[in-house]
């Protein structure tokens, strides 16, 4: 189609014309619908009229798009739209007039009026309106009291085209009456609006305003409707003017509920966001809250959330359940209903915690912890300790312990009454989670530690006596609020003033106790309106100083809390950018408030002291500890308090981060600052660096601390004040100072100092709990102190264990504090009752502590696990001296670990505290090598690493733990233990069937990695010697030395951290297990050679550590042998390539050298070798002989003995040296003679047989290996050794053993076939007679099924017939062997039968029939020889057999002159290169045989048709005749065998791209196809041309290409 288009014609013209036509059609339809609608409206058929109007409005011409715009506009369409909307508006007008009655609802009236307005206003968009439209709209706007809409509508009407003359001098008499009415309305409207207009002035100037007081005519019914609208509008205005009261309902008088309600009324905003500029969330409310009324549903007194009594409804830290329900009833429904709050579920905890606790709760098995209890009491009694109570004294139902010390009952009371308060106590000292990562390596400690330490609230006074904020105050406040109907903003102001201002000399903020939630909500509200309050009170700050001080204190408390959060994040390595930004903002607010508060001059001592203390707290948080302002402020406070000798305690019961204080506390703070200055100024003028300066500070501090507990650490007089201060200091300050020193040694990993100071700190904790003061405290205070002690205990215990683990649980360097064991026992018996008392009780239906407080219970469990870890470590030390005299105590330690593990795993926390219990348990269990210990170790292995040992599923319980990574420090002793336990005095290789520990050993070895790559001089030296040995040449001297135990590789012991594990045999045993698994997979044809790489590394590492195991060398050689076997087994490609074959030879050389070194190490101490070692050396001897046999015979042909082997190994990246390979392969230089190799093979096999015979006599073996005798006979059968008798004797022995030790179902036939073939060859060579051969075979019991007559030759026959009979008997015997081959893998008997038939009996046909069983030349697949390697055939030999079979088959075909079969076989050889050895030689022979057979069979004349004939035929005639032959090949009467041979020959030429087949192809074509056809058509006989004619013509000679083109065309047509 042409792409031409007219210039004056748009490509979319047809579409535009179609759209125009559619539009015109729609316009006609719309006018028709409009007329029909008017007729229905005229007849008052409102339903039909409405349907027609709806249909009209749905037309595309009328309907606007979704944006209210119209895509097309014209005068006709605009007029149509105007009429449609105008008359639709009057349709609703008439419908309303018709349907209106007094009973009509206001909603219906308003709905119809709005439809009228909507349609009429829309009509104004499309045309100028008529008077009726303006009149109706003006009346409706007037009823809606919208004067501005009236004014806009009238002015729009005056400005249209019909009215413009009104303002250009038109006389009053010429104005229409309707327009006069509009003018009158407009003038009156302006008067009502008290406005003026340009239009008004023009109207007045022209005199049109006179006598225009005409009233519009209004329908009476419509007038009533308008009056009703006016009334509705008036009601709405009045409703809008009334206040919108927001009701808040409370169940009872409760401050927390009220504040939570006020906070939830506003949008949710985080506290940090309130520090910004636009801080008040009220600005984001959708509607204003004009008034608030608080309604209390009923006055009932209920228990408060933090009551001191035991309350079963206390909230755990994982749940948010509010006791006092708050409901709002405003239209927005911001609050949830009471039902929703009551049915609120617990906050989702992590999956790990949820799974763990539910597992114990849902357990149906009753659990008793009595075995664990008495296991500990038993061992403690042996060590002279006594339990403080009996197990029967623990009452789970009563949650108490009957004991002399009240502390045990206090701990159980904590578990029963657990609440948020208990959680805060437990985490008050350490907010950070315990991290298992290594501590920092730096030993420098910044003095910021002192600031953090001395800024803590260590001296806060008790505020228990402060009353909680009362309900009476709330009643008083709510009465005032409800009476005044306060705006929400006003309500917040009044609330702040009520709580923060001074009332009767007290501020409720400091004189009453609030709940934490109440304080948080007050703080949130304060931050919300802080700007407004500041603006309000800054002008009269003296009057409102109490409110200002309260806000100042609140902001400071928020700032200190924010600083704590920043420090916590930074210490955990987290980012705190947002917090730092908010810190800057809140500091600006505090500075602003401080600027006006500092201006207050007052005599109010209480206000002044509190302001100074708040400012002191601010300076502590925001400046350096050495800031002089700190001491200055404290001095001012101290002076004021001393002046009045005041004993007043200034409390801050609600601010968590502002300490309460009194005169004594101020004195203490001054002493703190003095002490800090002294610590900072230690060695102030020293010239040493900062690190040494810090060290001197810590040494000084350590000596001072030690002097407080021991007179042996006396210090100078300059430090007496500091000592006095420490002696009188409270517990927490002492503990923090000790912890400072303690962490220094933890970071240094100093086990001696760490354990010493840990003992001191532990004693400090225990003494605090055992002192008399503790017993005099109230229940809550005792619980608080107990939990704080637990919190302190948590980190120091965990760190102590980390140091012990890093030092491999070392004991000889420990300086244990005297009472450490008894103190650990004390803590243990405090914590132990939590196990039985938390057992789930489904009958009671109550939650246990573990179930309701998962986070806190995890902390308690972790503490318990750490205490158990250290206690077990101590008890083991105490029992070690007793175990030597009482071995039965071994089971006591095992029983202790077992019962402890069972007990704590019931609640699934045996891996808590970084798995410390599992690690100490593993360490203790590995001391004992018995079945009980191994059983427990299996359980530990599962819990720690999730290793499921084989066959142990019924013994090991799969506790819900998190698998840990194995470290080198742990894996070393574990690997030694497993090897020692599993094998003990047994030989790992001989007794390696049990591989239960294989997974663990594999992971241990993986953890070690490749030790040969270490940066260790001895390892590198040994590796060099090892690699040098594997590169050495194989010589006769090498074999001679190995049998004498001489010339071993010179290796040294590295004696590093792995030496002990290597001597124990960790790598050796793991390698044996991996090799055994490889053998299993190899038998099922699933193994890969790459799997041997890791096994080789294991044995190599064992050798490099000079373990002197001859087995490692043997197994390493075995690995190399498996690689060689795999390379020779699957494909012949690797033996067809020189480079690849050299790689195989290199691996084979390594295997032989490894075997030789194994023999060297064995024979070095042959007399001391055990029976198991003799069994191993037998295998080594057999493997060496077998590998030598593979190496020396085809296809490897002694390549590994070539001294130039290293130059033959060429990497794929350097193929340029391949010519060197060919050059060197021509004349190889061998390092050993063939006779030496054969002598070595015989010696190895003879020694192996000798060892086997001795082992058989000793009952250690049950049979001899027939394959050894078979191999010896094979070696003797070579041409270089003429030992006929030894050969027959050994093969006969092999047959005898094979018959004796094999079953009928799995009979071995190899030695019997070999015996027949050997005797046959010996007979052919004339070395044995027929009678001797049959006599020897008769002695083989394998053939006992033949009768005696079979073995006798018929002497009456001539010699030739006797030979024929003899060969027939050999064939019968071979057929019998084939019948016994169950796997049908034996191929040699077929070949031997065919060989005898052809060579001796000249029966080619039958010989080919037998060879056809193993050779297939006519099958469609590429497989030529169908054989596979039998079990006892050496690797690679089947490729040699394949070559031999093909060569023999070619001889048969050549003898039979079967050219076609030879050709087919030659074709298959090209695709069979990976299936046989020496493929090049076979191809050459097949090609020559094919050409020879074709030439002889078809009497082809060499070069007759390729040179002389082709040069003398006419080219045109050749083209003509050859084309006719191709087109009529069937009519050409060509012999079928000629075509077939030609096809094969051409395909061979095409496949090889060689000229070898040119003569055959051209001769067959011209001699048997072209020339006969030409002669049968004499009328077209071509004329021979002369030389002159040949020169005159351009193209007369036929080329080879021309001939082959026709041959190809002919061949392609053949089937």
UniProtKB/Swiss-Prot annotation:
Transmembrane segments: none annotated. Keywords: Chromosome partition, Nucleus, Transcription, Transcription regulation. InterPro entries: Hir3/CABIN1. GO terms for biological process: chromosome segregation; G1/S transition of mitotic cell cycle; negative regulation of chromatin organization; negative regulation of transcription by RNA polymerase II; nucleosome assembly; transcription elongation by RNA polymerase II. One of its GO terms (cellular component) is nucleus. One of its GO terms (molecular function) is DNA binding. Its main location: nucleus. It is found in: Nucleus. Belongs to the HIR3 family. This is Histone transcription regulator 3 homolog. It comes from Candida glabrata (strain ATCC 2001 / BCRC 20586 / JCM 3761 / NBRC 0622 / NRRL Y-65 / CBS 138).
């Amino acid at each position: 189609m042409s792409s031409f288009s007219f210039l004056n014609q748009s490509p979319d013209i047809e579409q535009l014309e179609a759209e125009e036509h559619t539009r015109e059609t729609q316009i006609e339809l719309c006018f028709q619908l409009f007329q029909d609608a008017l007729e229905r409206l005229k007849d008052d058929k409102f339903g039909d009229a409405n349907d027609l109007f709806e249909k009209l409005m749905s037309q595309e011409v009328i309907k606007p798009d979704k944006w209210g715009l119209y895509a097309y506009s014209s005068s006709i369409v605009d007029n149509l739209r105007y009429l449609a909307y105008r008359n639709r508006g009057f349709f609703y007008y008439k419908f309303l007039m018709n349907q209106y009655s007094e009973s009509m609802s206001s909603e219906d009236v308003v709905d119809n009026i709005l439809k009228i307005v909507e349609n009429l206003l829309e009509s104004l968009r499309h045309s100028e309106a008529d008077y009726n439209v303006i009149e109706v709209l003006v009346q409706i706007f007037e009823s809606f009291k919208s004067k501005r809409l009236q004014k806009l509508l009238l002015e729009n009407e005056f400005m249209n085209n019909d009215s413009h003359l009104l303002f250009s001098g038109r006389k009053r008499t010429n104005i229409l009456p309707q327009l006069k009415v509009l003018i009158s309305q407009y003038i009156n409207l302006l008067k009502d609006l008290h406005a003026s207009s340009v239009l008004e002035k023009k109207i007045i100037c022209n005199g049109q305003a006179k006598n225009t007081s005409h009233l519009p005519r209004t329908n009476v019914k419509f007038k009533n409707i308008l009056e009703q609208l006016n009334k509705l509008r008036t009601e709405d205005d009045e409703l809008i003017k009334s206040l919108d009261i927001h009701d808040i309902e409370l169940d009872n008088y409760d401050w927390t509920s009220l504040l939570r309600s006020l906070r939830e009324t506003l949008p949710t905003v985080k506290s940090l966001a309130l520090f910004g500029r636009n801080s008040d969330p009220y600005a984001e409310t959708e509607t204003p809250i004009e008034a608030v009324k608080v309604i209390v549903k009923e006055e009932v007194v209920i228990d408060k959330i933090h009551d001191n009594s035991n309350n079963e409804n206390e909230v755990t830290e994982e749940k948010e359940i509010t006791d006092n329900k708050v409901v709002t009833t405003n239209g927005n429904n911001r609050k949830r209903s009471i039902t929703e709050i009551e049915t609120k579920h617990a906050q989702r905890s992590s999956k790990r915690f949820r799974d763990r606790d539910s597992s114990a709760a849902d357990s149906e098995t009753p659990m008793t912890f009595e075995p664990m209890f008495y296991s500990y009491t038993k061992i403690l009694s042996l060590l002279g300790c006594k339990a403080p109570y009996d197990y029967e004294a623990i009452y789970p139902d009563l949650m108490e312990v009957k004991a002399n010390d009240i502390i045990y009952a206090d701990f159980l009371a904590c578990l029963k009454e657990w609440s948020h308060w208990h959680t805060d106590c437990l985490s008050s000292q350490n907010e950070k989670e315990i991290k298992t990562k290594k501590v920092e390596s730096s030993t420098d400690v910044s003095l910021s530690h002192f600031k953090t330490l001395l800024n803590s609230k260590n001296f806060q006074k008790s505020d228990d006596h402060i009353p909680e904020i009362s309900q009476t105050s709330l009643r008083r406040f709510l009465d005032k609020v409800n009476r005044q109907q306060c705006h929400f903003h006003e309500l917040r102001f009044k609330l702040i003033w009520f709580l923060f201002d001074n009332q009767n000399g007290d501020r409720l903020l400091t004189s009453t106790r609030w709940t934490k939630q109440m304080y948080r909500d007050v703080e949130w509200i304060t931050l919300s309106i802080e700007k407004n309050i500041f603006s309000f009170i800054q002008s009269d700050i003296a009057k409102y100083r109490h409110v200002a001080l309260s806000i100042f204190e609140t902001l400071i408390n928020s700032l200190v809390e924010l600083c704590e959060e920043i420090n916590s994040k930074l210490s955990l390595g987290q980012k705190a950018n947002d917090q730092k930004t908010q810190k800057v903002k809140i500091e600006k607010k505090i500075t602003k408030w401080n600027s006006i508060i500092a201006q207050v001059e007052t005599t109010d001592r209480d206000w002044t002291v509190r302001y100074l203390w708040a400012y002191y707290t601010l300076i502590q948080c925001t400046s350096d500890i050495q800031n002089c302002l700190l001491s200055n402020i404290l001095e001012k406070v101290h002076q004021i308090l001393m002046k009045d000798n005041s004993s007043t305690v200034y409390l801050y019961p609600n601010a968590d981060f502002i300490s309460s204080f009194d005169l004594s506390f101020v004195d203490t703070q001054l002493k703190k600052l003095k002490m800090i200055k002294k610590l900072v100024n230690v060695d102030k003028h020293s010239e040493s660096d900062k690190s040494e300066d810090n060290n001197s500070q810590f040494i000084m501090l350590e000596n001072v601390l030690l002097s407080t507990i021991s007179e042996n650490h006396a210090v100078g007089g300059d430090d007496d004040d500091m000592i006095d201060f420490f002696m009188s200091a409270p517990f927490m300050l002492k503990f923090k100072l000790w912890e400072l020193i303690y962490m220094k040694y933890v970071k240094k990993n100093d086990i001696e100092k760490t354990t010493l100071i840990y003992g001191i700190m532990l004693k400090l904790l225990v003494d605090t709990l055992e002192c008399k003061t503790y017993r005099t405290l109230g229940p809550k205070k005792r619980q608080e102190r107990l939990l704080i002690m637990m919190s302190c205990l948590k980190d120091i215990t965990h760190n102590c264990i980390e140091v012990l683990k890093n030092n491999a649980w070392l004991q000889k360097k420990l300086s244990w504090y005297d009472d450490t064991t008894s103190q650990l026992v004390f803590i243990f018996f405090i914590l132990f009752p939590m196990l039985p008392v938390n057992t789930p009780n489904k009958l009671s239906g109550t939650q246990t502590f573990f179930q309701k407080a998962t986070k806190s219970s995890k902390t308690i469990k972790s503490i318990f696990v750490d205490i158990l870890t250290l206690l077990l470590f101590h008890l083991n030390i105490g029992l070690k001296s007793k175990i030597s005299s009482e071995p039965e105590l071994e089971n006591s330690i095992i029983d202790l670990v077992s019962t402890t593990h069972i007990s704590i795993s019931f609640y699934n926390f045996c891996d808590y505290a970084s798995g410390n219990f599992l690690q100490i348990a593993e360490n203790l269990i590995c001391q004992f090598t018995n079945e009980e210990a191994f059983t427990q170790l299996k359980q530990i292995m599962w819990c720690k690493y999730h290793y499921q040992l084989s066959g142990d599923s019924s013994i090991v319980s799969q506790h819900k733990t998190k698998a840990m990574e194995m470290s080198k420090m742990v894996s070393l002793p574990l690997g030694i233990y497993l090897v020692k336990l599993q094998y003990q005095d047994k030989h790992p290789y001989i007794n390696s069937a049990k591989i239960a520990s294989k997974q663990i050993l594999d992971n241990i070895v993986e953890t070690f990695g490749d030790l040969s790559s270490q940066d260790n001089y001895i390892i590198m030296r040994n590796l060099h010697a090892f690699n040098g040995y594997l590169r050495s040449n194989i010589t006769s001297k090498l074999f001679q030395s190995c049998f004498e135990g001489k010339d071993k590789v010179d290796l040294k012991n590295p004696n590093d951290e792995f030496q002990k594990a290597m001597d124990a045999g960790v790598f050796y045993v793991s390698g044996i297990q991996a090799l055994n698994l490889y053998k299993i997979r190899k038998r099922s044809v699933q193994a890969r050679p790459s799997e041997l790489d890791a096994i080789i590394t294991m044995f190599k590492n064992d050798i490099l550590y000079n373990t002197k195991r001859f087995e490692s060398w043997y197994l390493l050689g075995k690995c190399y042998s498996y690689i060689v076997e795999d390379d020779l087994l699957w494909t012949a490609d690797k033996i067809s390539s020189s480079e690849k074959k050299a790689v195989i030879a290199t691996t084979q050389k390594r295997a032989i050298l490894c075997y030789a070194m194994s023999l060297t190490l064995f024979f070095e101490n042959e007399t001391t070798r055990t029976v198991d070692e003799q069994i191993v050396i037998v295998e080594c001897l057999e493997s060496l002989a077998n590998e030598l046999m593979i190496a020396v015979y085809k296809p490897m042909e002694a390549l590994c003995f070539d001294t130039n082997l290293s130059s033959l190994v060429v990497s794929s990246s350097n193929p340029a040296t391949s010519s060197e390979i060919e050059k060197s392969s021509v004349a190889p230089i061998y390092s050993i003679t063939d006779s030496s190799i054969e002598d070595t093979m015989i010696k190895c096999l003879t020694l192996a047989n000798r060892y086997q015979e001795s082992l058989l006599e000793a009952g250690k073996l049950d049979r001899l290996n027939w394959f050894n005798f078979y191999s010896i006979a094979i070696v003797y059968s070579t041409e270089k050794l003429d030992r006929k008798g030894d050969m027959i004797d050994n093969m006969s022995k092999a047959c005898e053993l094979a018959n004796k030790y094999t079953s009928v179902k799995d009979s071995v036939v190899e030695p019997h076939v070999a015996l027949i073939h050997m005797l046959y060859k010996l007979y052919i060579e004339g070395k044995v007679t027929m009678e001797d051969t049959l006599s020897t075979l008769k002695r083989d019991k394998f053939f006992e099924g033949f009768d005696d007559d079979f073995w006798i030759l018929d002497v009456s026959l001539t010699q030739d017939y006797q030979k024929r009979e003899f060969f027939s008997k050999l064939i019968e015997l071979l057929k019998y062997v084939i019948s016994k081959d169950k796997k049908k893998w034996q191929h040699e008997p077929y070949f031997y039968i065919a060989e005898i038939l052809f060579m001796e009996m000249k029966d080619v046909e039958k010989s080919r029939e037998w060879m056809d069983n193993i050779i297939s030349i006519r099958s469609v697949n590429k497989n030529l020889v169908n054989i596979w390697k039998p079990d006892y055939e050496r690797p690679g030999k089947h490729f040699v057999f394949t070559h031999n079979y093909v060569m023999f088959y070619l001889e048969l075909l050549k003898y039979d002159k079967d050219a076609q079969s030879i050709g087919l076989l030659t074709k298959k050889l090209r695709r069979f290169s990976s299936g046989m050895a020496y493929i090049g030689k076979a191809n050459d022979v097949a090609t020559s045989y094919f050409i020879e057979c074709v030439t002889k069979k078809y009497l082809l004349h060499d070069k007759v048709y390729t040179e002389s004939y082709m040069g003398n035929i006419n080219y045109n005639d050749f083209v003509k005749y050859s084309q006719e032959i191709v087109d009529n090949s069937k009519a050409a009467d060509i012999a079928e065998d000629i075509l077939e041979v030609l096809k094969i020959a051409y395909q061979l030429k095409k496949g090889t791209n060689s000229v070898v087949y040119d003569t055959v192809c051209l001769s067959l074509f011209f001699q048997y196809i072209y020339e006969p056809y030409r002669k049968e058509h004499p009328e077209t006989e071509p004329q021979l041309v002369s030389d002159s004619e040949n020169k005159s013509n351009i193209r007369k000679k036929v080329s080879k290409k021309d001939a082959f083109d026709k041959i190809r065309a002919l061949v392609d047509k053949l089937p």
